[in-house]
Amino acid sequence: MASTRFALDVPARCASAGTLAPDVPLCLVFGWVNARDAHVKKYTDVLTRELECCATVRATMPTARAFSPFERSRVAYVTEALTFARRAYGGQTPRKVYLFCFSNGGCWVQATLARARAEGTIARELMFDFEGVIFDSCPAFMSMKSGGDALTAVMRQPLALVVRLTFYALVLVLATVHLCTGTYDQMLTRKFWTTMLNMPNEKKELYIYSLSDTLTDPQKLEALIAHRAKNSANVKVLCFEQSPHCAHLRKHPDEYVKALREFIV
């Protein structure tokens, strides 16, 4: 079952059901910037076919929304995703719901939800209380370089250069505006990191990353994890020495699947 933006996959035991029963766990899976759906589906297949532990809603936030300076664009997208998930359960609430974020493209969903809880920008009846949140290669500290790297990771030249330079120019313009108006702390990248540092604790949080992944900046991520643990978050970590950005499943399948099996219970 799929829509233009969102896809629902279910374990074989639920395939004949018109709507899902509340006792079927749900995992919302959001891919990285410019992710191909087939690549994100490899992860939902692990959950629905290999582990058969939950139904999944799969999506990737459009790049323009992920990098938009306007929060309402992301709020609208997340609202659509939550509405789609609710409809799959006939308006009922699954007893267990998980969130699975890849890189900052997916992590923007968690950041948007965290702010929506505080600001009331998403209807409370749409929101879920997560049983756990999985962060794969995120949250990544955003610098001008890392943002350009993420945007152009799968692009070819000369398009990659054009996109990178355009992105740099937009960041400089926005930074100048914030500096001139005394609102630098409200700049998109700073708000994102502050939100991820100080968001309300989930029941449990799993961070999957590698020390060789420069896009994620493992030192910054480890500092964030330590900060959250110090503030009583139930933190679990799966760290690899060598593994590419958002490709830990491919590089370390056994350890990765084991971590998912133990986390989604």
Which residues does each predicted region cover?
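Serine-hydrolase catalytic core
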Residues: 18-21, 164-259
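Residue in the alpha/beta-hydrolase core beta-strand immediately N-terminal to the catalytic nucleophile
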Residues: 96-100, 132
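Gly/Ala-rich beta-loop-alpha elbow adjacent to hydrolase catalytic centers
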Residues: 101-106
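Short glycine-enriched nucleophile-adjacent loop
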Residues: 109-119
